[in-house]
């Protein structure tokens, strides 16, 4: 803790005087929990982390350093999975805290948010004074999943409202244990940042590897079938399909949707649309997506003759 605090105190003095900007068929369907509070059809995996506690810093506006400052903190990291699902920080809050803690994901420290989420004070343990490690908790920041590029640097920016005595505690380490990133601090609401190469926050990121699907449409009598096959190396989670028939004169069967919780590598789904009845030239469209698969689609021109569908 002494290492972390001494490092930051020196940095706060520097920050006060400088303004440097750091510019099927699949039979293994199941439901599972992604974390303690949010139900999800898939289990994400730990990607990046630093969990070696050394001390805590106030996050927000307080006079912990002998003068009032609104401290915002950013942790850089380099993901190894293509999908980023959530992150955690080891944190607590002061008894007077009344505004949410906000986390934003960025690929540029002062750029646009790729994802953002607020967590209310009631989700944090309350402490009086500087917390011990046992008084802290891993807080989930469960934003909407985003695609990232493995090997590229991203930033987890954590802040709260600039209101006196509205502050949280966030844990870290002053010995640069995490090799793929570092801590940045701001005392002007994120306008300018100073980097501390010998410090890291206590954090975890979670994600999934991208996988790939192959799709095909097979028209026939009374109904149309389609095949979704996992041709990638990882399980596809929360697979959803949307089949539509557009054009022509369709009495029954314009839209069919479906979902399964997982499709393992090499596995395939053989699904049918149900009864299609109509006449005329139509377009058959199939869109498929999954939690860790970018949306793909296929279209086929066809003729519907009552209950028979033929691709043309």
Model-identified regions with their sequence ranges:
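Enriched for extracellular/lumenal, surface-exposed ectodomains of secreted and cell-surface proteins
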Residues: 160-162, 186, 244, 261, ...
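Secretory targeting signatures
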Residues: 1-46, 87, 156, 203, ...
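Short proline/glycine- and polar residue-rich coil/turn motifs
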Residues: 122-135, 260-268
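Beta-sheet-rich sandwich/jelly-roll-like modules and their strand-loop junctions
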Residues: 31-112, 146-153, 159-210
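Asparagine-centered strand-capping/turn motif at beta-strand->loop junctions
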Residues: 228-232
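Intrinsically disordered, low-complexity Pro/Gly/Ser/Thr-rich segments with frequent PxxP/GP/PP motifs
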Residues: 250-280
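Short beta-strand and strand-turn-strand segments in soluble, beta-rich domains
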Residues: 113-123, 247-258
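Terminal connector regions
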Residues: 275-312
